[in-house]
Amino acid sequence: SSSFGIFAGSDFDIEEAMRVALGEVKSIDFGALKEIAGMNPILAKRFYHETGSMFWLEIDLCPLEKVKEISSSYTSQPGVVGQLLLTIPTNGETEEQNRKLCQEATAASKGFEIITGFAPRSWEIVNLSKEVIALEKIRNENPELAGDPVARKEVQARLAEAHGLLEAEVMRLMDGTIWHRANEAPKRYRQNELNLLASTIADKHFCKTPVVLNELINRVRPSSNANAAQNALLRRMLSHENSERLGIEGFPAEAGLYESVLKLSGLHKKSGKEFVIAKPSKSDPCRFLPLWDAAEELLRSDEKLFSMSDVFKLWQSPPYGVKNGILQLLGTAFVLTMRENLAIYREEVFQTRLTDLEIELLTINPSKIQIRWMNL
Protein backbone atom coordinates (compact mmCIF):
# COMPACT_ATOMS: atom_id res chain seq x y z
CA SER A 1 0.00 0.00 0.00
CA SER A 2 1.18 3.53 -0.74
CA SER A 3 1.66 6.14 1.93
CA PHE A 4 2.80 9.70 2.37
CA GLY A 5 5.61 10.97 4.63
CA ILE A 6 6.94 14.34 5.72
CA PHE A 7 10.65 14.95 5.25
CA ALA A 8 12.62 17.95 6.45
CA GLY A 9 13.92 20.12 3.63
CA SER A 10 15.81 23.37 3.21
CA ASP A 11 15.46 26.47 1.07
CA PHE A 12 18.99 27.65 1.84
CA ASP A 13 21.28 27.54 -1.23
CA ILE A 14 24.60 26.47 0.26
CA GLU A 15 26.43 26.42 -3.08
CA GLU A 16 25.44 30.02 -3.85
CA ALA A 17 26.35 31.08 -0.31
CA MET A 18 29.78 29.46 -0.75
CA ARG A 19 30.33 31.25 -4.06
CA VAL A 20 29.54 34.61 -2.48
CA ALA A 21 31.55 33.95 0.68
CA LEU A 22 34.62 32.78 -1.24
CA GLY A 23 34.45 35.95 -3.31
CA GLU A 24 34.59 38.01 -0.13
CA VAL A 25 37.70 36.23 1.21
CA LYS A 26 40.40 38.41 -0.31
CA SER A 27 43.36 37.45 1.88
CA ILE A 28 44.40 34.98 4.55
CA ASP A 29 44.87 35.90 8.19
CA PHE A 30 47.92 33.76 8.94
CA GLY A 31 47.43 34.14 12.69
CA ALA A 32 43.93 32.71 12.37
CA LEU A 33 45.20 30.07 9.94
CA LYS A 34 47.59 28.73 12.58
CA GLU A 35 44.68 28.25 14.99
CA ILE A 36 42.40 26.79 12.33
CA ALA A 37 45.05 24.28 11.31
CA GLY A 38 45.63 23.17 14.92
CA MET A 39 49.41 23.53 14.74
CA ASN A 40 51.02 22.36 17.99
CA PRO A 41 54.53 23.29 19.16
CA ILE A 42 57.43 20.86 18.81
CA LEU A 43 58.38 19.70 22.31
CA ALA A 44 62.00 19.22 23.40
CA LYS A 45 61.16 15.79 24.83
CA ARG A 46 64.65 14.50 25.58
CA PHE A 47 65.58 17.77 27.28
CA TYR A 48 62.41 17.55 29.37
CA HIS A 49 63.13 13.98 30.49
CA GLU A 50 66.68 14.94 31.47
CA THR A 51 65.99 18.23 33.29
CA GLY A 52 62.28 18.27 34.12
CA SER A 53 61.96 21.63 32.30
CA MET A 54 59.69 21.88 29.28
CA PHE A 55 60.88 23.90 26.29
CA TRP A 56 59.60 23.88 22.74
CA LEU A 57 59.85 25.19 19.20
CA GLU A 58 56.96 27.33 18.02
CA ILE A 59 55.44 26.60 14.61
CA ASP A 60 54.06 29.43 12.58
CA LEU A 61 52.84 30.09 9.06
CA CYS A 62 53.67 33.23 7.15
CA PRO A 63 53.50 34.59 3.60
CA LEU A 64 56.81 34.11 1.83
CA GLU A 65 57.11 37.81 1.05
CA LYS A 66 57.23 38.65 4.80
CA VAL A 67 59.51 35.87 6.05
CA LYS A 68 62.62 38.09 6.36
CA GLU A 69 60.69 40.79 8.22
CA ILE A 70 59.16 38.30 10.65
CA SER A 71 62.44 36.47 11.19
CA SER A 72 64.46 39.61 11.99
CA SER A 73 61.87 40.98 14.44
CA TYR A 74 61.12 37.73 16.30
CA THR A 75 61.07 37.90 20.11
CA SER A 76 60.90 34.72 22.15
CA GLN A 77 58.39 33.95 24.89
CA PRO A 78 59.14 31.99 28.09
CA GLY A 79 59.71 28.33 27.32
CA VAL A 80 60.33 28.91 23.61
CA VAL A 81 63.78 28.04 22.22
CA GLY A 82 63.09 29.00 18.62
CA GLN A 83 60.59 29.07 15.81
CA LEU A 84 59.78 26.99 12.77
CA LEU A 85 58.44 29.31 10.06
CA LEU A 86 56.59 27.49 7.30
CA THR A 87 56.35 29.86 4.35
CA ILE A 88 53.44 30.02 1.92
CA PRO A 89 53.95 31.62 -1.52
CA THR A 90 51.03 34.03 -1.93
CA ASN A 91 52.32 35.92 -4.98
CA GLY A 92 53.21 33.05 -7.28
CA GLU A 93 56.86 32.87 -6.20
CA THR A 94 58.95 30.10 -7.73
CA GLU A 95 60.62 27.33 -5.74
CA GLU A 96 64.01 28.98 -6.31
CA GLN A 97 62.72 32.31 -4.97
CA ASN A 98 61.27 30.48 -1.99
CA ARG A 99 64.58 28.79 -1.24
CA LYS A 100 66.53 32.05 -1.54
CA LEU A 101 64.21 34.01 0.76
CA CYS A 102 64.20 31.23 3.37
CA GLN A 103 68.00 31.19 3.45
CA GLU A 104 68.16 34.98 3.80
CA ALA A 105 65.54 34.97 6.57
CA THR A 106 67.42 32.32 8.55
CA ALA A 107 70.62 34.35 8.29
CA ALA A 108 68.78 37.49 9.43
CA SER A 109 67.48 35.95 12.67
CA LYS A 110 68.99 37.20 15.92
CA GLY A 111 69.30 35.47 19.27
CA PHE A 112 67.01 32.45 19.29
CA GLU A 113 66.94 30.25 16.22
CA ILE A 114 64.55 30.83 13.37
CA ILE A 115 64.25 27.81 11.09
CA THR A 116 62.48 28.59 7.84
CA GLY A 117 60.99 26.12 5.43
CA PHE A 118 58.96 25.61 2.31
CA ALA A 119 57.11 22.64 0.88
CA PRO A 120 56.03 21.73 -2.65
CA ARG A 121 52.38 22.56 -3.43
CA SER A 122 52.08 24.60 -0.24
CA TRP A 123 49.58 26.88 -2.00
CA GLU A 124 46.95 24.17 -1.44
CA ILE A 125 46.76 25.26 2.17
CA VAL A 126 45.63 28.72 1.03
CA ASN A 127 42.68 27.28 -0.90
CA LEU A 128 41.63 25.07 2.01
CA SER A 129 41.97 28.00 4.40
CA LYS A 130 39.72 30.15 2.24
CA GLU A 131 37.13 27.38 2.22
CA VAL A 132 37.19 27.16 6.04
CA ILE A 133 36.90 30.94 6.39
CA ALA A 134 34.05 31.05 3.86
CA LEU A 135 32.12 28.32 5.70
CA GLU A 136 32.62 30.14 9.01
CA LYS A 137 31.28 33.32 7.41
CA ILE A 138 28.20 31.43 6.21
CA ARG A 139 27.64 29.93 9.67
CA ASN A 140 28.10 33.22 11.52
CA GLU A 141 26.57 35.75 9.12
CA ASN A 142 23.36 34.06 7.94
CA PRO A 143 20.64 34.39 10.60
CA GLU A 144 18.25 32.30 8.50
CA LEU A 145 20.28 29.22 9.45
CA ALA A 146 18.90 29.51 12.98
CA GLY A 147 15.50 28.37 11.71
CA ASP A 148 16.81 25.86 9.18
CA PRO A 149 18.27 22.83 10.98
CA VAL A 150 18.90 20.93 7.73
CA ALA A 151 21.04 23.70 6.22
CA ARG A 152 22.72 24.36 9.55
CA LYS A 153 23.69 20.70 9.85
CA GLU A 154 25.02 20.68 6.28
CA VAL A 155 27.15 23.78 6.87
CA GLN A 156 28.53 22.33 10.10
CA ALA A 157 29.35 19.03 8.39
CA ARG A 158 31.16 20.80 5.56
CA LEU A 159 33.06 22.95 8.05
CA ALA A 160 34.18 19.91 10.05
CA GLU A 161 35.33 18.19 6.86
CA ALA A 162 37.22 21.30 5.71
CA HIS A 163 38.94 21.57 9.09
CA GLY A 164 40.00 17.93 8.84
CA LEU A 165 41.34 18.38 5.32
CA LEU A 166 43.25 21.49 6.37
CA GLU A 167 44.86 19.77 9.37
CA ALA A 168 45.81 16.80 7.18
CA GLU A 169 47.30 19.14 4.57
CA VAL A 170 49.38 20.91 7.22
CA MET A 171 50.73 17.56 8.43
CA ARG A 172 51.55 16.60 4.84
CA LEU A 173 53.33 19.90 4.35
CA MET A 174 55.34 19.46 7.55
CA ASP A 175 56.51 16.03 6.40
CA GLY A 176 57.57 17.40 3.01
CA THR A 177 59.03 20.71 4.14
CA ILE A 178 62.65 21.51 3.40
CA TRP A 179 63.96 23.38 6.46
CA HIS A 180 66.79 25.91 6.51
CA ARG A 181 68.98 26.35 9.60
CA ALA A 182 71.86 28.78 9.85
CA ASN A 183 75.20 27.23 8.82
CA GLU A 184 73.60 23.91 7.86
CA ALA A 185 72.50 22.32 4.61
CA PRO A 186 68.72 22.36 3.97
CA LYS A 187 67.00 19.11 4.93
CA ARG A 188 63.68 17.46 5.74
CA TYR A 189 62.85 16.36 9.28
CA ARG A 190 60.46 13.64 10.40
CA GLN A 191 58.35 14.37 13.49
CA ASN A 192 60.72 12.57 15.89
CA GLU A 193 63.66 14.38 14.30
CA LEU A 194 61.97 17.71 14.96
CA ASN A 195 61.64 16.74 18.64
CA LEU A 196 65.34 15.89 18.71
CA LEU A 197 66.11 19.20 17.01
CA ALA A 198 64.14 21.07 19.68
CA SER A 199 66.15 19.30 22.40
CA THR A 200 69.44 20.07 20.64
CA ILE A 201 68.54 23.76 20.48
CA ALA A 202 67.45 23.71 24.14
CA ASP A 203 70.83 22.16 25.04
CA LYS A 204 72.54 25.04 23.25
CA HIS A 205 70.59 27.93 24.76
CA PHE A 206 69.87 26.49 28.24
CA CYS A 207 73.00 24.50 29.01
CA LYS A 208 72.88 25.50 32.71
CA THR A 209 69.23 24.67 33.34
CA PRO A 210 68.87 23.02 36.76
CA VAL A 211 67.55 19.47 37.03
CA VAL A 212 64.24 19.50 38.90
CA LEU A 213 62.29 16.31 38.26
CA ASN A 214 59.09 17.49 39.89
CA GLU A 215 56.43 18.38 37.35
CA LEU A 216 54.13 19.89 39.98
CA ILE A 217 56.44 22.83 40.66
CA ASN A 218 58.90 22.94 37.74
CA ARG A 219 56.56 24.73 35.39
CA VAL A 220 55.49 28.21 34.34
CA ARG A 221 52.12 28.11 36.13
CA PRO A 222 51.91 25.63 39.02
CA SER A 223 48.51 24.63 40.37
CA SER A 224 47.06 26.20 43.49
CA ASN A 225 47.81 22.97 45.39
CA ALA A 226 51.46 23.07 44.29
CA ASN A 227 51.74 26.71 45.36
CA ALA A 228 50.21 25.89 48.74
CA ALA A 229 52.73 23.06 49.21
CA GLN A 230 55.60 25.36 48.30
CA ASN A 231 54.40 28.04 50.75
CA ALA A 232 54.24 25.46 53.53
CA LEU A 233 57.77 24.33 52.71
CA LEU A 234 59.08 27.92 52.68
CA ARG A 235 57.70 28.54 56.17
CA ARG A 236 59.33 25.34 57.44
CA MET A 237 62.67 26.47 55.98
CA LEU A 238 62.49 29.42 58.38
CA SER A 239 61.08 27.69 61.44
CA HIS A 240 62.60 24.17 61.30
CA GLU A 241 65.92 24.56 59.49
CA ASN A 242 67.83 22.49 62.05
CA SER A 243 65.35 19.60 62.07
CA GLU A 244 65.51 16.47 59.95
CA ARG A 245 63.18 16.81 56.92
CA LEU A 246 62.46 20.33 58.24
CA GLY A 247 60.25 18.67 60.84
CA ILE A 248 57.87 17.31 58.19
CA GLU A 249 56.03 14.23 59.41
CA GLY A 250 54.51 11.69 57.07
CA PHE A 251 54.19 12.59 53.43
CA PRO A 252 52.09 15.74 52.90
CA ALA A 253 52.40 17.61 49.59
CA GLU A 254 55.37 19.69 50.74
CA ALA A 255 57.31 16.51 51.55
CA GLY A 256 57.54 15.68 47.86
CA LEU A 257 59.03 19.10 47.15
CA TYR A 258 61.46 18.69 50.03
CA GLU A 259 62.67 15.29 48.81
CA SER A 260 63.01 16.23 45.12
CA VAL A 261 64.58 19.67 45.61
CA LEU A 262 66.08 20.42 49.02
CA LYS A 263 67.20 16.94 50.08
CA LEU A 264 68.30 15.60 46.70
CA SER A 265 70.35 18.70 45.93
CA GLY A 266 71.96 18.85 49.37
CA LEU A 267 70.53 22.30 50.02
CA HIS A 268 69.24 20.83 53.30
CA LYS A 269 71.64 18.38 54.86
CA LYS A 270 73.16 17.24 58.14
CA SER A 271 76.22 19.14 59.30
CA GLY A 272 77.65 17.90 62.58
CA LYS A 273 74.82 17.20 65.00
CA GLU A 274 72.13 19.24 63.26
CA PHE A 275 70.65 19.95 59.87
CA VAL A 276 71.36 23.16 57.96
CA ILE A 277 70.41 24.87 54.71
CA ALA A 278 73.70 25.00 52.81
CA LYS A 279 75.05 26.30 49.52
CA PRO A 280 74.92 23.72 46.70
CA SER A 281 78.09 21.83 45.82
CA LYS A 282 79.68 21.01 42.48
CA SER A 283 78.43 17.42 42.82
CA ASP A 284 74.80 18.53 43.28
CA PRO A 285 72.69 16.39 40.89
CA CYS A 286 70.18 19.25 40.58
CA ARG A 287 72.88 21.61 39.20
CA PHE A 288 71.92 24.59 41.38
CA LEU A 289 75.49 25.89 41.85
CA PRO A 290 75.54 27.87 38.55
CA LEU A 291 72.45 29.77 39.77
CA TRP A 292 74.17 30.67 43.04
CA ASP A 293 77.34 31.74 41.22
CA ALA A 294 75.40 33.90 38.76
CA ALA A 295 73.40 35.61 41.52
CA GLU A 296 76.54 36.24 43.57
CA GLU A 297 78.29 37.73 40.55
CA LEU A 298 75.32 40.03 39.97
CA LEU A 299 75.29 41.22 43.59
CA ARG A 300 79.05 41.75 43.69
CA SER A 301 78.91 43.84 40.49
CA ASP A 302 77.45 46.87 42.29
CA GLU A 303 76.99 48.12 45.84
CA LYS A 304 73.38 49.12 45.16
CA LEU A 305 70.30 47.23 46.29
CA PHE A 306 69.15 44.48 43.97
CA SER A 307 65.57 43.27 44.17
CA MET A 308 64.81 39.57 44.17
CA SER A 309 62.99 40.14 40.89
CA ASP A 310 66.42 41.11 39.44
CA VAL A 311 67.79 37.77 40.58
CA PHE A 312 64.76 35.92 39.25
CA LYS A 313 65.04 37.66 35.87
CA LEU A 314 68.67 36.55 35.65
CA TRP A 315 67.77 32.97 36.51
CA GLN A 316 64.96 32.88 33.95
CA SER A 317 67.19 34.07 31.11
CA PRO A 318 69.57 31.86 29.09
CA PRO A 319 71.56 29.80 29.87
CA TYR A 320 69.54 29.00 33.04
CA GLY A 321 65.85 29.02 32.06
CA VAL A 322 64.45 28.51 35.56
CA LYS A 323 60.65 28.13 35.54
CA ASN A 324 58.41 30.55 37.46
CA GLY A 325 57.08 27.83 39.72
CA ILE A 326 60.35 27.12 41.49
CA LEU A 327 61.79 30.65 41.71
CA GLN A 328 60.50 31.41 45.21
CA LEU A 329 61.86 28.16 46.65
CA LEU A 330 65.30 28.66 45.12
CA GLY A 331 65.30 32.37 45.98
CA THR A 332 64.57 31.66 49.64
CA ALA A 333 67.25 28.97 49.72
CA PHE A 334 69.76 31.37 48.16
CA VAL A 335 69.12 34.09 50.74
CA LEU A 336 69.33 31.62 53.63
CA THR A 337 72.54 29.96 52.42
CA MET A 338 74.22 33.32 51.77
CA ARG A 339 72.81 35.19 54.78
CA GLU A 340 76.23 35.92 56.27
CA ASN A 341 77.06 38.03 53.21
CA LEU A 342 73.64 39.53 52.51
CA ALA A 343 71.77 42.49 53.94
CA ILE A 344 68.01 42.01 53.55
CA TYR A 345 65.55 44.84 52.91
CA ARG A 346 61.77 44.99 52.72
CA GLU A 347 60.69 47.91 50.54
CA GLU A 348 64.19 49.36 51.08
CA VAL A 349 63.95 49.14 54.89
CA PHE A 350 66.66 46.98 56.50
CA GLN A 351 65.51 43.73 58.12
CA THR A 352 67.58 41.82 60.65
CA ARG A 353 66.46 38.46 59.27
CA LEU A 354 64.14 36.76 56.83
CA THR A 355 60.62 36.31 58.24
CA ASP A 356 57.28 34.95 57.06
CA LEU A 357 56.35 38.44 55.86
CA GLU A 358 59.34 38.60 53.50
CA ILE A 359 58.55 35.09 52.27
CA GLU A 360 54.97 36.13 51.51
CA LEU A 361 56.15 39.22 49.61
CA LEU A 362 58.72 37.11 47.78
CA THR A 363 55.85 35.02 46.47
CA ILE A 364 53.48 37.89 45.67
CA ASN A 365 55.84 40.68 44.58
CA PRO A 366 59.58 39.85 44.66
CA SER A 367 60.49 43.41 43.64
CA LYS A 368 59.59 44.51 47.20
CA ILE A 369 62.37 42.38 48.69
CA GLN A 370 65.89 43.71 48.14
CA ILE A 371 69.32 42.35 49.00
CA ARG A 372 72.83 43.82 49.05
CA TRP A 373 76.16 42.02 49.08
CA MET A 374 78.38 42.72 52.07
CA ASN A 375 82.11 41.97 52.01
CA LEU A 376 82.67 40.76 55.56
Segment roles from a protein language model:
Residues 1-376:
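Extended alpha-helical scaffold and adjacent linker segments that couple domains
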